[in-house]
Design a protein with these regions (language model features):
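Active-site pocket-lining/capping segments in soluble small-molecule metabolic enzymes
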Residues: 1-344
């Protein structure tokens, strides 16, 4: 039959297949028709779709699924009973090379900077050869590179390695070949190298990553499970303060002033920025686990990251965040995101 494209306001009829009343894979369920069986309103859809039943699994099927689940759980890495609380090392993510001076602040162990043409050019204005800064600077590869950019960043990585920078943070599998042929390089995984379970962590370890970063969307329970297996996995860093990236895309947002706040119907605010040909949408409130550092320490977290790339490490806001970090005090107008409420 000839089908039409469904548009907003069109009426849609649901056809229940003649297969015992249940939907099966491959069934053509929705089609446009002239009869107003129901509108696309949530209430009408719910009333109609509630009539669709899911077949009950047989006892044999339930037993097979239960056995598969038990076998999968039994094959996981063993968890330690109670992780030993250790001192936490802090890495600060800055906005520009001048932010490297945050390394002079007490309690700051490392400094991280996104590798861009601007930060590479600004490196000339900083005495990065200081003996007390050696080995403490991490360069992060941007998550999205296109076309000839990959080769340009490959050359930049080689140049930085030649200047004594040995630590780099990756954000996807495509970054690994950049470091082919380079010696004495330490590769770290960013939060986009998703590590939501121990099997993922082991896979990244096999690929050569010596440190991993927990996903910004992770929750307390899952982080605890990962940290309980720390003896068998690469060290896991947890970001305790960061802008919350909602979207990163090449699609431009027209007619919006960079940095302005857009308000959704539910009241949520989003800030839009245009950088290096990419559109970055950030949540109005930053993610913050400040106030939970003692708990993370008891869970076995030994590496924490404070991302000040939006405001700058030496700005008034940056100093406020670092002071709150030192005191383990929560900051207003921030959100713990999924940490307390759990993964949806």
């Amino acid at each position: 039959k000839k089908l039409k494209v469904v548009k907003a306001g069109d009426f849609v009829r649901v056809r229940i297949p003649d297969k015992g009343g249940f939907f099966q894979v491959g069934d053509k369920v929705f089609k446009v028709g002239g009869k107003a069986a129901f509108t696309m309103s949530p209430e009408a859809c719910r009333t109609t779709l509630d009539q669709v039943a899911v077949p009950e699994k047989s006892p044999a099927q339930k037993e097979i699924l239960a056995q598969a689940r038990s076998q999968g759980l039994a094959s996981l890495l063993p968890a330690s009973a109670s992780p030993v609380a250790s001192a936490q090392t802090l890495t600060v993510r800055g906005r520009e090379p001048q932010d490297m001076h945050v390394l002079d602040e007490p309690g700051v162990a490392g400094f991280e900077l996104v590798l861009t043409p601007e930060t590479l050019a600004g490196l000339k204005k900083v005495d990065h050869h200081r003996a007390d800064w050696q080995g403490r600077v991490i360069w992060e590869i941007p998550p999205m590179l296109f076309g000839a950019e990959w080769d340009e960043y490959r050359r930049a990585v080689g140049m930085l390695a030649g200047q004594g920078f040995k630590r780099f943070r990756l954000n996807n599998l495509g970054h690994l070949p950049m470091f082919a042929g380079l010696s004495e390089i330490s590769l770290l995984g960013g939060f986009r190298c998703y590590t939501l379970n121990s099997q993922a962590a082991l896979a990244w370890q096999e690929l050569g990553l010596g440190e991993l970063t927990a996903d910004l969307e992770d929750d307390r329970k899952n982080l605890q499970e990962l940290l309980r297996r720390a003896d068998h996995l690469p060290p896991l860093a947890i970001t305790i303060y960061s802008p919350l990236v909602v979207m990163l895309s090449r699609i431009p947002v027209r007619g919006v002033r960079p940095g302005s706040v857009l308000r959704a119907e539910g009241g949520e605010g989003y800030r839009v920025f245009q950088r290096h040909g990419l559109t970055e949408v950030l949540a109005e409130q930053d993610v913050s686990l400040l106030g939970h550092l003692a708990e993370l320490k008891r869970m076995g977290c030994t590496r924490i990251i404070v991302d000040l790339s939006q405001c700058g490490a030496l700005s008034a806001r940056g100093k406020q965040v670092l002071a709150a970090c030192a005191a383990d005090q929560p900051l207003p107008e921030t959100t713990p995101f999924n940490y307390q409420r759990g993964l949806a």
